[in-house]
A protein has these predicted regions:
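N-terminal onset of structured domains
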Residues: 97-99
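Short, low-hydrophobicity acidic/polar segments
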Residues: 1-84
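Tryptophan-paired
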Residues: 1-28, 101-220
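Extended, compositionally biased alpha-helical segments that mediate assembly or anchoring
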Residues: 215-232
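A short, Gly/Thr-enriched small/hydrophobic beta-strand-prone motif that recurs across taxa
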Residues: 80-95
Length: 232
């Protein structure tokens, strides 16, 4: 993007991404502390928020202390971006061979991650429930271990959900946003179970919970070992 600015030293702050769905609200301000970002949501009667559709992709970037000189010309700076939105795809597999109906199951992610400060740290927020915006039944063939020439069918329900940041809310977020301090981000295991971001699958026929797992913990289990190379 191109901007015309007077000579001086600036902190470059970027909230960017798609805007087709109007999923996020960012106020217009010249003060970075007012440039917060809020995920738009449907308000529930119990004081919680609900997201039932796929939402815009969001990125955040911050590059402090960049100088635009007195000499007229073009100054180019690259602002590194962090992706704030994540697509979660769940495959619920039936081992008995029985066909599964996607309408039988509900998938949701619950988190307190719908408000972000100017520096991309999470602000205090109500619990937000992200519902699956796509579900379908599917079948895949698989070979039997003892009979390599035999193939059996595996039935499953596939669900897709989109959530904001995959991180836990800092216990000191209220203090941090008021004082400007920045304590270390707490790890998921330091929080009580009810505060963790959770993925829950429910059987609508029986009303029972099929599974409920701390999503951040499980995401870390499958995190790749790839590191961005340092070019010299």
């Amino acid at each position: 993007m191109e901007v015309d600015v007077a000579p001086g030293t600036y902190d470059l702050l970027a909230w960017c991404g798609s805007t087709d769905k109007g999923s996020f609200r960012i106020p217009e301000s010249a003060s970075r502390k007012e440039l917060t970002c809020t995920l738009m949501r449907e308000s529930g009667t119990d004081g919680t928020g609900h997201i039932r559709e796929d939402h815009d992709r969001l990125y955040h970037g911050y590059l402090p202390n960049q100088t635009f000189g007195d000499t007229e010309g073009i100054y180019t700076y690259v602002v590194p971006l962090v992706k704030n939105t994540n697509n979660v795809r769940v495959v619920l597999q039936q081992t008995s061979g029985e066909r599964l109906d996607e309408k039988r199951f509900s998938f949701r992610i619950t988190a307190e991650n719908g408000r972000m400060d100017w520096d991309n740290q999470l602000l205090p927020d109500e619990p937000v429930t992200y519902h699956a915006w796509h579900k379908q039944s599917a079948t895949a063939g698989t070979a039997l271990p003892d009979l390599p020439d035999a193939v059996t069918s595996v039935n499953a329900v596939i669900a897709e959900l989109t959530t904001a940041r995959l991180m836990v809310r800092d216990k000191s977020a209220t203090v941090r946003s008021e004082t400007g301090t920045n304590p270390p981000q707490l790890q998921p295991e330091e929080l009580p179970e009810e505060r963790k971001m959770r993925l829950t699958v429910r059987d609508n026929d029986t009303g029972k919970t099929v599974l409920s797992i701390p999503l951040v913990d499980y995401a870390l289990l499958v995190k790749g070992e790839y590191c961005v190379p340092s070019w010299s």
